[in-house]
Amino acid sequence: MLVQQEPDASSFPNGGIRNTFEARGYSAWDPTSPAFIVGGTLCIPTVFIAYTGEALDYKVPLLRSISAVNKAATEVCRYFDKEVNRVIQYLGWEQEYFLVDESLWAVRPDLMLTGRTLMGHESAKNQQLEDHYFGAIPTRVIAFMADLEYECLKLGIPVKTRHNEVAPNQFELAPVYEECNLANDHNQLLMTIMDKIARRHNFRVLLHEKPFKGINGSGKHNNWSLGTDTGVNLLSPGTVSYTHLTLPTIRL
């Protein structure tokens, strides 16, 4: 039952590309991403595909791209090292976000409904503040961050850094890099946890890419790299003579 299920997929906006009898979708266990427990519920990472094989989620295209890059890059790497059997894609994401006091959030219908401001006036000082970026983190925010990091580590998300970002009340969290598929799953899980922990501390977290006009938005930088199963970083020039050719070859 865990390996494959057949839920209804007829309500997805697929533009009528399937006949009614083909409206079913298939969920399948993704064994490359570990299962985890939240609130007493076992959560199993899955993919979701149509009867005819089209992707009905974002994980399937990601896994297909990982497979394609692995196949192409491994063939290239074996010109330099016959011991290479697999090329791994690594990802280190950076999660930027804004924290807003819940009482202030509650009087802004635009924030409540859309997660961003749709009206208002710019403040007298925005990013001109010189004491915010990488400055001392407020005590209340530190308490939120510590609680968030504890919950993340319980779920295996290897969070590592935290700091003030450029805009007022903007912050950032980043983990140790992981394999691409797992890193993506962990980021999706993190955003869910952030919302829950923020409410616990009487905050609301804004994850919209541009919640306020006139100041920095919240980017999500993706630090992507390639490495072989023999431990070679393909985006590093290396110290051995033949590895000097690997980087320009991979880039080409």
Language model: regions and residue ranges:
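ATP/Mg2+-dependent ligation/transfer catalytic cores
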Residues: M1-A146
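Core alpha/beta catalytic barrel or barrel-like domain that forms the active/cofactor pocket
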Residues: G39-I49, E83-V100, M112-G135, K154-Y177, ...
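Alpha-helix N-cap/helix-initiation motif
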Residues: Y58, L62, R86, I137, ...
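Secondary-structure capping and boundary motifs in well-ordered enzyme cores
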Residues: S65, R140, E165-V166, L182-H186, ...
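Generic, well-ordered alpha-helical scaffold segments in large soluble proteins
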Residues: A72-F80, F144-P158, L190-H201
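Well-ordered mid-protein domain cores that form the structural environment of catalytic cofactors
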Residues: L173, N184, L189-T192
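Conserved small/polar residues in nucleotide/adenosyl-binding loops
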Residues: T243-T249
